[in-house]
């Protein structure tokens, strides 16, 4: 880690904004400014090479770029607010210039609209449940936001239950609100999570790693024995297997796999598969 | 001696009142600010950045409903652009054309008057087809 740190320190000392394209996959530190591809030509290195004037106006060819978590807009540039690696995703359907974000690691969750999270019901006041999601405030969940719930037909939710839902309102100015139905009114797997099982907390980066489409860990875990897992984007995982011992083994694996290399992991899985 | 005010003086008084009221309204004495069009959109959600799978998973048949959901949600997320172009037809085109042909006759018979029933004759198959056109008045040539 000494090399990327020294490179970053040099660029900060030079206080020159780097092009986002050249920094992809490298460590960026908060306070750095990044140039988007359209601008780096205009502010090219030095004046030694004279560029021929292009007749087509550059300003018209700008595309919309989305700056994701860890980045902020600062004039025409991107300002880094978290330390981590810079990532980029090309636009799939052709509109816009893609997404830039910083792949950082943290344990504290900040509610974001659209995220599916696991919450614990802490209070029931009138028509609203207060659900603890690990943020600064408990989220509110109305009793009508369940599938098939009406004023007469109330959902069976008690204090202490686990709820899998998504946020509809989540910003820094208001209390977060969550629901257990989607926009069509269907539950889609959201709602009260069943009996038994074990809930534990991991870092947010691990959740994203486990939910990646090509995650080997999940594929290997699925071959061990019948089990059920629910991932919440707030760092909470709920697991359930047939016996308590299997559940505990699963919880330990998922917690430990963040810091294991793939060889160590394969060793552990082969040992488990034997026993 | 006039008791009330003159209409002109009334108008003047009203105008003065309106002026006082509109001057009391506050306004900003700033030059027009043009909103800069920004090409960068800020989003705090990871859903746009990475394709993440659905959060509920079940393996080896532990929870069949969740396994069904997994297939649904992950398939929806992967194959959003693939559309089925071959739509299977329940009824073939030819049969549809035949039905329409006879349908016109059947419905037409319903609205035809008694005299026109002669136009609608049934042939061997039982299909009702309108045979003759309606009799129009023919003008004599002379």
Curated annotation (Swiss-Prot), chain A:
Role summary: Non-catalytic component of the RNA exosome complex which has 3'->5' exoribonuclease activity and participates in a multitude of cellular RNA processing and degradation events. In the nucleus, the RNA exosome complex is involved in proper maturation of stable RNA species such as rRNA, snRNA and snoRNA, in the elimination of RNA processing by-products and non-coding 'pervasive' transcripts, such as antisense RNA species and promoter-upstream transcripts (PROMPTs), and of mRNAs with processing defects, thereby limiting or excluding their export to the cytoplasm.
Gene3D superfamilies: 2.40.50.100, K Homology domain, type 1, Nucleic acid-binding proteins
Modification type N-acetylalanine: residues: 2
Sequence position, cross-link Glycyl lysine isopeptide (Lys-Gly) (interchain with G-Cter in SUMO2): 151
Subunit structure: Component of the RNA exosome core complex (Exo-9), composed of EXOSC1, EXOSC2, EXOSC3, EXOSC4, EXOSC5, EXOSC6, EXOSC7, EXOSC8 and EXOSC9; within the complex interacts with EXOSC5 and EXOSC9. The catalytically inactive RNA exosome core complex (Exo-9) associates with the catalytic subunit EXOSC10/RRP6. Exo-9 may associate with DIS3 to form the nucleolar exosome complex, or DIS3L to form the cytoplasmic exosome complex. Exo-9 is formed by a hexameric base ring consisting of the heterodimers EXOSC4-EXOSC9, EXOSC5-EXOSC8 and EXOSC6-EXOSC7, and a cap ring consisting of EXOSC1, EXOSC2 and EXOSC3.
Family note: Belongs to the RRP40 family.
GO cellular component terms attached to this protein's record: cytoplasm; cytoplasmic exosome (RNase complex); cytosol; euchromatin; exosome (RNase complex); nuclear exosome (RNase complex); nucleolar exosome (RNase complex); nucleolus
One GO BP annotation of this record: RNA processing
Lineage: Eukaryota, Metazoa, Chordata, Craniata, Vertebrata
A GO term for molecular function: RNA binding
Pfam families xref list: KH_6 (PF15985), RRP40_N_mamm (PF21261), RRP40_S1 (PF21262)
The protein, known as: Exosome complex component RRP40
Keywords: Acetylation, Cytoplasm, Disease variant, Exosome, Isopeptide bond, Neurodegeneration, Nucleus, RNA-binding, rRNA processing, Ubl conjugation
Involvement in disorder: Pontocerebellar hypoplasia 1B: A severe autosomal recessive neurologic disorder characterized by a combination of cerebellar and spinal motor neuron degeneration beginning at birth. There is diffuse muscle weakness, progressive microcephaly, global developmental delay, and brainstem involvement.
Regions annotated as coiled coil: none
Cellular localization per UniProt: Cytoplasm; Nucleus, Nucleolus; Nucleus
